[in-house]
């Protein structure tokens, strides 16, 4: 895939045919675009190209808007910058978005983007799913594997859409509230919203079938193909979806399965390269090659500490002081952020509104973290060095799922299942590479709080922040520097669970204009 990925937009049969129109089998036997989808998807090589196209769609620029880059935008704009624990330092011009004031603006591109992106994935996946018939006895193993991959893309997309455009499960009347549009065939006419319960049922059904097909195929993805869904990816999607649905036993079951063959990264990997260089902990990820870069649209062009993009050099990302202060002194993960000393904080060259330093803290930052900064980067207190680009201006790969999330998912589920010893063991296993002094003995509500804390610490900056706070039904509370926190006063807000349309993005006007079954 790395040099030959084909980006496909398979929203129509014609586009599917265009994807494979250069394949010699069709050039030799039929005119361009003459082959039927049944013929195309009976050929494993052609079907594989279509699934590779789905992977490429996760790192592609969209809507002619800088920064809308596929999956990375969802992580940064919708998961991180709008959350409780990350600040886009001094980027006050974007405060309306980062402070969650766009949820009810149905004509905004920020409301429309996730809908557009995930339904583009769904439409493409449906071409593969509907084009490959797997009920017969003579179906090639690879076709089963490819169909299972497409089912993973669809299940993941439906799940992500439900997190954004539907109420949190606890407020959904046990799933009776509106879900999303469940397009599972090639029709494109008007279609109403499902319920949220129906949405989760479809996600589960897709994953059940994917798991069955993966197992029946007897195939594993190739070494290094972290961008391609496989059996463990299906397990991981299942675990995350079940956790969000508060289906605790299912979440614990699939989290354990998903992480079984993906050991946690070492301490050195975690501190230096574990988030932009694929490693064994990654279960699924997004691949961006230097010869296929999307330049200033890329994920790391928005939150890479060493990126050359002005968005990172001038407005780096930083952890909240409140979260940083809860990380034990013995925990090596503290080294991923720039904590000011008392002297560095007290000097006049540290701006007490923005948190920017032009003095002692700046000097130390370039001395200690010079290889993780661009030469002209501005320095702010608590700025991060966890996420770095692999090539300029801000390119590189990143994970969607990794084992640490599965440990934390299983631990959170175990808390709700009254399996306290199991949850304690999972936390100890997760943290031993970072803090040799760590030993969890907490119980009850304190144990659940501990799991949530380490989820915030270990998965910081990976796109979970806003989504976790939504499902937990906890308020976002950001404190300004003047009030003992680290946020610019423009971002220092409290967002209650009932604010911002209950943290639910409205159905975009573009969909309602086209689909008269949605009002």
Language-model-detected regions and their locations in the chain:
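Short, surface-exposed recognition loops and adjoining beta-strand edges that mediate ligand/DNA contacts
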Residues: 37-38, 65-85, 167-176, 216-299, ...
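Hydrophobic-face positions in mid-chain alpha helices that act as interaction patches
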Residues: 252-399, 403, 458, 473, ...
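Conserved, well-structured interaction surfaces
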Residues: 90-164, 194, 212-214, 392-398, ...
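Bacterial Sec-dependent N-terminal signal peptides
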Residues: 1-31
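Membrane-proximal, proline-rich intrinsically disordered regions
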Residues: 22-76, 255, 314, 323-329, ...
């Amino acid at each position: 895939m790395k040099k030959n990925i084909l980006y496909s937009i398979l929203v129509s049969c014609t586009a599917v045919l265009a994807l494979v129109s250069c394949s010699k089998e069709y050039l030799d036997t039929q005119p361009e675009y003459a082959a039927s989808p049944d013929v195309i998807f009976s050929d494993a090589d052609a079907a594989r190209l279509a699934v590779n196209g789905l992977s490429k769609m996760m790192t592609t620029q969209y809507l002619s808007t800088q920064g809308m880059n596929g999956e990375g935008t969802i992580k940064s704009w919708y998961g991180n910058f709008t959350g409780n624990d990350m600040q886009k330092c001094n980027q006050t011009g974007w405060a309306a978005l980062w402070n969650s004031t766009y949820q009810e603006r149905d004509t905004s591109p920020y409301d429309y983007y996730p809908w557009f992106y995930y339904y583009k994935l769904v439409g493409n996946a449906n071409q593969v799913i509907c084009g490959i018939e797997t009920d017969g006895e003579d179906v090639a193993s690879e076709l089963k594997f490819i169909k299972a991959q497409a089912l993973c893309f669809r299940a993941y997309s439906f799940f992500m859409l439900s997190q954004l455009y539907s109420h949190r499960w606890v407020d959904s009347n046990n799933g009776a509230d509106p879900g999303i549009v469940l397009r599972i065939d090639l029709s494109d006419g008007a279609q109403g919203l499902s319920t949220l319960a129906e949405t989760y049922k479809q996600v589960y059904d897709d994953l059940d079938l994917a798991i069955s097909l993966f197992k029946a195929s007897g195939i594993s993805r190739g070494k290094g193909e972290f961008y391609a869904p496989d059996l463990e990816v299906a397990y991981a999607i299942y675990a995350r979806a079940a956790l969000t649905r508060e289906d605790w036993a299912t979440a614990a079951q699939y989290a354990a399965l998903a992480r079984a063959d993906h050991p946690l990264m070492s301490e050195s990997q975690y501190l230096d390269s574990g988030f932009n260089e694929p490693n064994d902990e990654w279960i699924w990820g997004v691949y961006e090659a230097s010869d296929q870069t999307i330049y200033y649209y890329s994920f790391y062009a928005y939150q890479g500490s060493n990126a050359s993009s002005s968005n990172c050099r001038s407005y780096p990302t930083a952890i909240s002081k409140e979260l940083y202060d809860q990380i034990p002194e013995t925990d090596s993960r503290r080294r991923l952020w720039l904590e000011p000393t008392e002297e560095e904080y007290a000097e006049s060259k540290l701006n007490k509104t923005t948190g920017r330093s032009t003095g002692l803290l700046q000097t130390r930052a370039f001395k200690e973290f010079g290889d993780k900064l661009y030469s002209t980067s501005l320095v702010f207190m608590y700025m991060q060095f966890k996420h770095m680009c692999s090539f300029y201006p801000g390119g590189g790969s990143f994970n969607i799922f990794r084992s640490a999330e599965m440990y934390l998912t299983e631990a959170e589920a175990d808390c709700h299942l009254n399996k306290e010893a199991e949850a304690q063991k999972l936390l100890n296993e997760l943290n031993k590479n970072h803090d040799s002094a760590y030993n969890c003995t907490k119980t009850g509500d304190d144990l659940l709080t501990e799991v949530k804390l380490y989820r915030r610490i270990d998965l910081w900056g990976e796109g979970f922040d806003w989504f976790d706070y939504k499902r937990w039904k906890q308020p976002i509370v950001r404190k300004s520097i003047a009030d003992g926190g680290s946020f610019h006063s423009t971002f220092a807000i409290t967002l209650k669970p009932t604010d911002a349309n209950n943290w639910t993005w409205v159905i975009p006007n573009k969909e309602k204009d086209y689909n008269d079954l949605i009002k």
